[in-house]
């Protein structure tokens, strides 16, 4: 399905073997929709990797099975029926250029079975029941992550409970900025340099570490959870396209939360 969609968009935006900026602009619904489609496909692929890893480790229990089947049922249903890119924009496969015959090819018997029987009300209710029973657990089901990431999760979960949750509501009601004391503490814990290479003052950890940290801080207050993503985005752009002088000047400053 994805390869067919890529071919359709190529036909719309390529000129002499290269993407035309003007055509991408003119066909932005198809181009944007292709990005969403590719994201959905990759999300399901990674969901399957997660499930197979847990199965091999004998950790694929009822909660994990329900998460797996609900995710596949929902996303496959959206791929065929329409991807909600926002509240008022639904991406249909025909918007990318697929024909009705090409769309129907997706609905082979196994896909039909999943879309009809996986994401049911009974499955969702059972998952919610299990989530309530296990509300003391930090995550819903096994994450499949390594021990280092689990340790990072626990560290930032404790920080969020102690230093963020008790004050978050007041910050919100008073429309206050996050206190500098919190930002300084996060900097000391390495939040702003998680994925920045060590030679530039960062910790050189994986993108998964940034996701784990953001998740746990967001449990306390979503604004705090988003702080580290700002330097993450800026650092990635500088690493990919900046000069060595820019990297030497900016990346260590990001990692330490100091002014360059």
Regions found by a protein language model. Give the residues of each.
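FAD-binding core of flavoproteins
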Residues: 1, 6, 106, 115-119, ...
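Extended amphipathic alpha-helical segments enriched in small hydrophobics
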Residues: 1-55
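Generic structural signal for well-ordered, non-transmembrane alpha-helical segments
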Residues: 3, 32-35, 39-42, 66, ...
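Short, solvent-exposed segments of well-ordered alpha helices
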Residues: 18-38, 59, 63-70, 143, ...
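Short glycine/serine- and small hydrophobic-enriched flexible loop segments
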Residues: 36-39, 46-52, 74-77, 215-219, ...
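Short secondary-structure subsegments characteristic of cysteine-rich extracellular domains
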Residues: 44-75
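Intrinsic disorder at enzyme termini
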Residues: 74-158
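Glycine-rich flavin
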Residues: 89, 158, 165-260
């Amino acid at each position: 399905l994805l390869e067919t969609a890529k071919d359709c968009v190529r036909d719309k935006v390529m000129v002499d073997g290269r993407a035309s900026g003007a055509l991408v602009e003119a066909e932005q619904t198809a181009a944007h929709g292709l990005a969403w489609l590719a994201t959905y496909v990759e999300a399901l692929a990674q969901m399957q990797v997660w499930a197979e890893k847990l199965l091999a480790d004998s950790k694929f229990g009822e909660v994990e099975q329900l998460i797996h089947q609900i995710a596949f049922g929902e996303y496959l249903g959206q791929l065929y029926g329409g991807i909600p890119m926002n509240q008022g924009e639904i991406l249909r496969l025909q918007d990318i250029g697929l024909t009705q015959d090409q769309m129907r090819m997706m609905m082979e018997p196994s896909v039909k079975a999943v879309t009809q029987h996986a994401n049911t009300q009974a499955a969702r209710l059972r998952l919610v029941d299990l989530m309530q029973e296990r509300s003391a657990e930090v995550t819903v089901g096994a994450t499949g992550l390594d021990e280092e990431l689990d340790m990072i999760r626990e560290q930032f979960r404790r920080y969020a409970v102690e230093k963020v949750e008790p004050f978050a509501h007041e910050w919100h009601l008073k429309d206050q900025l996050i206190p500098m004391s919190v930002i300084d503490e996060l900097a000391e814990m390495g939040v702003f340099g998680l994925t920045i290479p060590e030679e530039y003052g960062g910790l050189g950890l994986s993108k998964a570490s940034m996701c784990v940290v953001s998740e746990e801080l967001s449990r306390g207050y979503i604004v705090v959870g988003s702080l580290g993503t700002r330097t993450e985005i800026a650092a990635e752009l500088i690493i990919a396209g900046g000069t060595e002088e820019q990297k030497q000047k900016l990346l260590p400053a990001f990692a330490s939360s100091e002014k360059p």
